[in-house]
UniProtKB/Swiss-Prot annotation:
InterPro entries: V_ATPase_D (IPR002699)
Function: Subunit of the peripheral V1 complex of vacuolar ATPase. Vacuolar ATPase is responsible for acidifying a variety of intracellular compartments in eukaryotic cells, thus providing most of the energy required for transport processes in the vacuolar system.
Biased composition (Basic and acidic residues): 216-226
Name of the molecule in the record: V-type proton ATPase subunit D
UniProt-listed Gene3D superfamilies: 1.10.287.3240
GO molecular function: proton-transporting ATPase activity, rotational mechanism
Family statement: Belongs to the V-ATPase D subunit family.
PANTHER family, alphabetized: V-TYPE ATP SYNTHASE SUBUNIT D
One term under GO cellular component: proton-transporting V-type ATPase complex
Segments of this protein annotated with the region Disordered: 211-233
Source organism: Dictyostelium discoideum (Social amoeba)
Keywords, ordered alphabetically: Hydrogen ion transport, Ion transport, Transport
């Protein structure tokens, strides 16, 4: 097995346990990242559909706003300077919040308040074209609301696109790099441990065979020594008895007269 396709680790049972734990964690992480990617992809497609729909509505809204502005200018003349002079506070405020989707914080923009129109603004165009100016203001308010919604969707779209790419790269890295390396490492450790067990078993068999051989040799030597001792013992006893038997004869000879 090539060392490039596995981790460089010494094959022990502890290392095998560690690799199995890492593989289990990698499988769990791959499953969770896959679910996260699927959830983000579903939300991504939904946002994309909303963007397409809002852009179509945006075209209609901006067209109405432009026509209403042209009609107001036709009816009241140039009134932009008068409007700018009468504006002191913004009539629309935008608030940014975050939405958590599968651990990803998506920025969301929303209109939180609409200021009260001042009397000077209401009186703009009172002499002529006042109705057209009010219609133009309402049309532009709708256009701003549509722009806020579209900006929120596009920001979430870009954020999700980046997160989905990163998540998919992690999923592919675990699936095609991390898991195969861990599996190959586990196979390598198991193979080496099996080989070590076979070598140890062979060594033990050789040691056991040598011990049996030595034991048989000792038993054979012991039996040979016992046989030699048995052969030598009768001659010694006979000789001793002969000497004892001769002594009384000598004693009788000494005391006879």
């Amino acid at each position: 097995m090539s060392g490039k396709n596995r981790l460089n680790i010494f094959p022990t049972r502890m290392a095998l346990t560690v690799m199995k734990t890492k593989l289990k964690g990698a499988v769990t992480g791959h499953s969770l990242l896959k679910k996260k990617s699927d959830a983000l992809t579903i939300r991504f497609r939904r946002i994309l559909a909303n963007i397409v729909e809002n852009k179509q509505l945006m075209g209609t809204t901006m067209r109405d706003a432009s026509f209403s502005l042209a009609a107001a200018k036709y009816a009241a003349g140039e009134f932009s300077n008068s409007v700018i002079e009468n504006v002191s506070n913004p009539t629309i405020a935008v608030k940014m919040t975050t939405e958590n989707v599968a651990g990803v914080h998506l920025p969301t923009f929303e209109k939180i308040s609409e200021g009260v129109v001042s009397n000077s603004q209401e009186l703009t165009g009172l002499s002529k074209g006042g109705q057209q100016i009010n219609k133009s203001r309402e049309s532009h308010i709708k256009a701003v609301e549509a722009l806020i919604a579209l900006a929120s969707l596009q920001t979430a779209f870009i954020t999700l696109d980046e997160v989905i790419k990163i998540t998919n790269r992690r999923v592919n890295a675990i699936e095609y790099v991390v898991k195969p390396k861990l599996e190959n490492t586990i196979s390598y450790i198991i193979t080496e441990l099996d080989e070590s067990e076979r070598e140890e078993f062979y060594r033990l068999k050789k040691v056991q065979g040598k011990k049996k051989k030595d034991l048989k040799a000792k038993e054979a030597q012991k039996e040979e020594n016992s046989a030699n001792k048995t052969i030598m013992e009768p001659a010694s006893v006979h000789k001793v008895r002969s000497l004892i038997d001769d002594e009384p004869e000598d004693a009788e000879l000494l005391y006879e007269d």
